[in-house]
Amino acid sequence: MIIIMKPQATEEQIGSLCQDLRRQGMQVQRNAGVDCTVLGVLGDVAKLDPHDFLIQPGVERVMPVSEPFKKANRKFHPTDSVIDCSGVKVGGRKLALFAGPCSVENYDQITDTALKVRASGANILRGGAYKPRTSPYAFQGLKLEGLALLEQAKELTGMPICTEIMSPKLVEEFDRRVDVIQVGARNMQNFDLLTELGQTRKPILLKRGLSATINEWLMSADYIMAAGNPNVILCERGIRTFETYTRNTLDLSAVQAVKRLSHLPVIVDPSHAAGLNWMVERMSLAAIAAGADGLIIEVHNNPPKALCDGAQSLTPDQYAQLVGKISALAPIVERTL
């Protein structure tokens, strides 16, 4: 349920109403907008009579919320959220550019790539230390060694680091060492992991599951937020359809849908969606045109030699060319780099 206060509602009126709701066992999420304050009410709201609140001083109107997701709901939080990733903002007018290799392989590879993507305009370094693979025989990542290499690349470049987490057991380690914790598509509904991540305050990059609906995706965001962490960034990375030419089908309509339904920022991963590096540039530009708050793109300093996903990785030169085109497009959609 949403309670919208009048613009002239006093602090005393708002505070009294919040106390009354909490006495009735409700959780109250308070959001101060430009013109008025909005109270998001969570709990067994079926036992509440909306008319009882309409007669309270300072109340403008009461609205039920039919969507199953609450904290991620734009009705609860009408203004766009901007997530601070160790100094880099995700959301708002400025585009966030995550870039780096699919997997961290060695010191030279990660530092060379990091320096080159930073020079091109990327502001967050991505790289996999733990790799969830379809085959148990495929390269699984360097794990803790890879995490240490990412930290060295961060120290060298000053870029915040983003890497994927696989297990709730790793949350404490990642909370200490990583700037943005990525939850991959396979773990979007790993509710134990999501709840554990809710105990941190680190930004969580939540990728959409292979076959997840938009509602399911936003409910997974709610798992993190309901546990106490409001810093969630959504990532559209393609969904599984009947088409087999590309790895996945990039659902750009989801960007607009999520923007309408939720206040959370949403970025796009064209690399995993296409699975083919020659598609990445056009899909990236389309994502920005569709309203994405940023991109996460795989870049490798030698794609033919990559241990993982070389076919979808751009070279540093290709990435620099892409950023130049994004820079030209950004003002048209009222964005900046």
Could you describe each region identified by the protein language model?
Residues 95-112, 135-140, 160-164, 185, ...:
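Active-site mouth loops of central-metabolism enzymes
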Residues 129-133, 187-253:
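Conserved anion-binding
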Residues 132-178, 182, 190-193:
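N-terminal active-site wall of soluble small-molecule enzyme domains
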Residues 1-97:
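Non-catalytic terminal accessory/regulatory regions of metabolic enzymes
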Residues 139-163, 197-203, 252-266, 312-335:
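Alpha-helix-loop-beta-strand connector modules within alpha/beta enzyme cores
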